[in-house]
From Swiss-Prot:
Signal peptide: none annotated. Belongs to the universal ribosomal protein uL24 family. Residues 1-21 are annotated as: Disordered. This is Large ribosomal subunit protein uL24. Keywords: Ribonucleoprotein, Ribosomal protein, RNA-binding, rRNA-binding. The keyword Nucleus does not apply. It comes from Gloeobacter violaceus (strain ATCC 29082 / PCC 7421).
Length: 116
Protein backbone atom coordinates (compact mmCIF):
# COMPACT_ATOMS: atom_id res chain seq x y z
CA UNK A 1 0.00 0.00 0.00
CA UNK A 2 1.43 3.37 -1.01
CA UNK A 3 0.97 6.60 0.88
CA UNK A 4 1.56 10.07 -0.47
CA UNK A 5 1.89 13.09 1.77
CA UNK A 6 0.92 15.55 -0.95
CA UNK A 7 4.34 16.13 -2.46
CA UNK A 8 6.85 13.98 -4.29
CA UNK A 9 6.73 10.26 -4.91
CA UNK A 10 4.53 7.79 -3.06
CA UNK A 11 6.17 5.89 -0.19
CA UNK A 12 5.31 2.21 0.19
CA UNK A 13 4.53 0.57 3.51
CA UNK A 14 6.93 -2.28 4.28
CA UNK A 15 6.65 -5.46 6.34
CA UNK A 16 10.46 -5.78 6.41
CA UNK A 17 13.17 -3.56 7.86
CA UNK A 18 16.89 -3.21 7.31
CA UNK A 19 18.69 -6.11 9.03
CA UNK A 20 15.75 -8.57 8.83
CA UNK A 21 16.39 -12.09 7.55
CA UNK A 22 14.10 -12.86 4.62
CA UNK A 23 13.41 -15.67 2.14
CA UNK A 24 12.63 -15.04 -1.54
CA UNK A 25 9.25 -16.57 -2.43
CA UNK A 26 9.20 -16.15 -6.23
CA UNK A 27 11.45 -15.59 -9.21
CA UNK A 28 14.83 -16.98 -10.23
CA UNK A 29 16.17 -16.82 -6.66
CA UNK A 30 13.16 -18.56 -5.06
CA UNK A 31 14.10 -20.21 -1.76
CA UNK A 32 17.26 -18.17 -1.14
CA UNK A 33 17.70 -16.64 2.32
CA UNK A 34 19.55 -13.40 3.09
CA UNK A 35 19.61 -10.23 5.16
CA UNK A 36 17.98 -7.00 4.01
CA UNK A 37 20.83 -4.55 3.47
CA UNK A 38 18.77 -1.61 2.19
CA UNK A 39 15.12 -0.54 1.88
CA UNK A 40 13.99 1.68 -1.03
CA UNK A 41 10.64 3.19 0.09
CA UNK A 42 9.84 5.22 -3.05
CA UNK A 43 10.43 2.21 -5.34
CA UNK A 44 8.77 -0.38 -3.07
CA UNK A 45 11.89 -2.55 -3.25
CA UNK A 46 14.54 -4.01 -0.96
CA UNK A 47 18.13 -5.13 -1.51
CA UNK A 48 18.93 -8.56 -0.05
CA UNK A 49 22.51 -9.76 0.41
CA UNK A 50 23.45 -12.48 -2.11
CA UNK A 51 20.10 -12.38 -3.94
CA UNK A 52 19.29 -11.09 -7.46
CA UNK A 53 22.96 -10.73 -8.40
CA UNK A 54 23.67 -8.80 -11.60
CA UNK A 55 26.90 -8.35 -13.55
CA UNK A 56 28.04 -4.87 -14.54
CA UNK A 57 30.81 -4.43 -17.09
CA UNK A 58 32.99 -1.37 -16.45
CA UNK A 59 35.05 0.09 -19.30
CA UNK A 60 38.68 1.06 -18.74
CA UNK A 61 39.02 4.67 -17.52
CA UNK A 62 42.40 6.35 -17.91
CA UNK A 63 44.96 4.25 -16.01
CA UNK A 64 42.35 1.87 -14.53
CA UNK A 65 41.64 -1.51 -16.11
CA UNK A 66 38.20 -2.61 -17.22
CA UNK A 67 36.43 -5.11 -14.98
CA UNK A 68 33.19 -6.93 -14.28
CA UNK A 69 31.40 -6.22 -11.00
CA UNK A 70 28.78 -8.45 -9.34
CA UNK A 71 26.24 -6.64 -7.17
CA UNK A 72 22.79 -7.12 -5.70
CA UNK A 73 19.91 -5.52 -7.58
CA UNK A 74 16.68 -4.41 -5.87
CA UNK A 75 13.77 -6.85 -5.60
CA UNK A 76 10.12 -6.01 -4.89
CA UNK A 77 9.29 -6.28 -1.19
CA UNK A 78 6.20 -8.40 -1.95
CA UNK A 79 8.53 -11.12 -3.27
CA UNK A 80 10.16 -11.72 0.13
CA UNK A 81 8.90 -13.20 3.42
CA UNK A 82 10.34 -12.85 6.88
CA UNK A 83 12.40 -15.89 7.91
CA UNK A 84 13.00 -17.45 11.31
CA UNK A 85 16.65 -18.52 11.77
CA UNK A 86 15.73 -20.62 14.82
CA UNK A 87 12.96 -22.68 13.18
CA UNK A 88 14.27 -22.41 9.58
CA UNK A 89 10.81 -21.39 8.39
CA UNK A 90 9.35 -18.45 6.43
CA UNK A 91 6.31 -16.74 7.91
CA UNK A 92 3.94 -13.83 7.54
CA UNK A 93 4.22 -10.99 10.01
CA UNK A 94 1.69 -9.85 12.59
CA UNK A 95 1.66 -7.03 15.10
CA UNK A 96 0.97 -7.24 18.81
CA UNK A 97 1.36 -5.08 21.90
CA UNK A 98 3.64 -6.26 24.71
CA UNK A 99 2.89 -5.98 28.43
CA UNK A 100 5.06 -2.85 28.47
CA UNK A 101 2.75 -1.26 25.89
CA UNK A 102 5.21 -1.44 22.99
CA UNK A 103 3.96 -2.47 19.53
CA UNK A 104 6.18 -5.25 18.10
CA UNK A 105 6.30 -7.43 14.99
CA UNK A 106 5.69 -11.16 15.47
CA UNK A 107 6.15 -14.09 13.08
CA UNK A 108 2.74 -15.76 12.78
CA UNK A 109 3.92 -19.37 12.33
CA UNK A 110 6.59 -19.44 15.05
CA UNK A 111 5.44 -16.72 17.46
CA UNK A 112 8.97 -15.27 17.45
CA UNK A 113 9.17 -11.55 18.34
CA UNK A 114 11.26 -9.54 15.84
CA UNK A 115 11.48 -6.10 17.47
CA UNK A 116 13.35 -5.86 20.74
Amino acid sequence: MATNNGAGKARHKFHVKKGDTVQVISGKDKGKVGKVSEVLPTAGKVIVEGVNMQTKHVKPQGDQQGQTLRREAPIYSCKVMLYSDKKKQASRVGHTVTDAGKKVRVLKKTGEILDK
